Amino acid sequence: MKRSLLVVTAVLLAGLWASRAGLRAQDNPKADDYKISDADVARVNPVKSSPEGLAEARKVFGYDCEMCHGAKGDGKGEVVESMKLTMRDWRDPATLAKLSDGEIFYIITKGKGKMMAEGDRVPEKLRWNLVNLVRALAAKGGGEQKSAAATPAP
């Protein structure tokens, strides 16, 4: 009896979370109408890439980003097909060549299309470390990067 009640409670909570997440994702700008201000584009990453920062970002990536972006950042996450997503391969430097750190930070913070915003859940420094991690994925096909903070905006 207790187990049944626990299972029902877990299912209800998961449904509530999923519906809330769906509403938040729907509020995000569609990929086609996405416009980032010049000030946000020009933002420079104030957080120097470090093994500790990348490890912390990797944890968040693992439970928040990996399901869509894939464990290696290749865009082959487990929900891509079922959600009908078109994902980019972050390991390819050409994918990120035209994006500044400020743009990546903005997308992580505000979300985009079906991607949920992390701004209200993840501290700013950790979001900048996620930018460093995304740059590191492209730097060595999923490896580490020397310093994303020094990467100039295009």
Set out the residue ranges of the language-model regions.
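Detector for the c-type heme attachment site
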Residues: 69-75, 94, 109, 119, ...
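C-terminal capping alpha-helices of c-type cytochrome domains
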Residues: 106-113, 119-148
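Electrostatic cytochrome c docking/interface patches
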Residues: 28-60, 151-154
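C-terminal segment of classical bacterial N-terminal signal peptides
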Residues: 14-22
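Sequence/structural segment immediately N-terminal to covalent heme-attachment motifs in c-type
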Residues: 51-74, 104-110
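Bacterial N-terminal signal peptides that target proteins for export
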Residues: 1-9, 19
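Electron-transfer interface patches adjacent to heme c in soluble/periplasmic c-type cytochromes
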Residues: 85-102, 117-127
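Short cysteine/histidine-rich zinc-coordinating motifs and their immediately flanking basic loops
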Residues: 78-82
